[in-house]
Amino acid sequence: MPKRKRAGAGSLSERIGFEAEVEGDDGYGGVVVGFAEQFVEPARLEPRVGNETVIASRLQGMQPFTMTVRSNERTRTITPAWQARNKRTGVVYAIKAAVNIDERNQWIELLVVQGEAG
């Protein structure tokens, strides 16, 4: 199995806005739920390929990605209740999991899915 390329500053080529779910007033006494951008971070997006689950997801119009961001005070607050938006393309990704892969608080790896409602 080939080794994955390690993330570095040069590989963080995408600008991703991370959005948390918020509630607001709809003006008629009701509540509107939506997403509001919390911060923007550079990230690396790598399509997931190969296994049976990934192939099944593609057949349903969803593409899973691994998103890598630098670990910092803000990115450590990301949860699966959030969504990510590519600032360049406008594509929205549902966040499925956030993991500190190197356990040294250098990088956070997010499993995200394009084409699925957050």
Language model features with spans:
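Short, conserved turn/kink motifs that form compact alpha/beta structural patches or helix kinks used as
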Residues: 24-25, 30-118
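Active-site-proximal polar cores
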Residues: 1-31
